[in-house]
Design a protein with these regions (language model features):
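Nucleic-acid substrate recognition interfaces
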Residues: 1-154
Length: 154
């Protein structure tokens, strides 16, 4: 049986890296909110026709309209889509959970998740490698990681 473990480490980003992370947080939030808005519109349009199969856009659709989305990790944007899908499924499964809400810039807790593909997320002694970031991020590794890194949430 495969066992997944979560490790929590503190990172010490430089000023340039902080700007990159805040840009990524903003782009993930934007894509999530745009996709939620599109889903609400599609649901309103198809309300009268239950047989109509609704096709939802992917984050790639928004990259044509918003060029700055190309500067951040595409897997972070894809994970925003997966989070929205999960929120929708949870809502339709159990109405008491509540309808998915738009993400706010004012929320002090902001994060994004990226997946490891061929070593794009890796830890070298005291340094963390993150996709689309040119430099390594300083990290405090206080215990040994066993196994393979599947994803990282920043």
């Amino acid at each position: 049986m495969i066992q997944l473990k979560a490790y929590k480490f503190r990172i010490y980003p430089s000023d340039e890296q902080k700007i990159f992370f805040s840009k990524t947080f903003g782009c993930v939030r934007l894509v999530y909110n745009l996709m939620l808005n599109d889903r609400i519109k599609a649901y309103e349009e198809s309300k009268g026709n239950p047989d109509k199969k609704i096709k939802y856009p992917t984050p790639a659709k928004y990259k044509k309209e918003y060029e700055f989305l190309k500067e951040v990790d595409s897997l972070a944007l894809a994970n925003a889509q997966m989070n929205l899908d999960k929120a929708y499924k949870n809502f339709f499964r159990n109405k008491s959970i509540g309808f998915p809400k738009f993400k706010s810039k004012k929320n002090p807790v902001q994060s994004y998740t990226t997946n490891n593909q061929n070593g794009t997320v890796n830890i070298f002694r005291k340094w963390l490698k993150v996709p689309k970031l040119k430099e390594l991020v300083k990290i405090k590794v206080h215990r040994k990681i066993e196994g393979i890194i599947k994803s990282a949430t920043i």
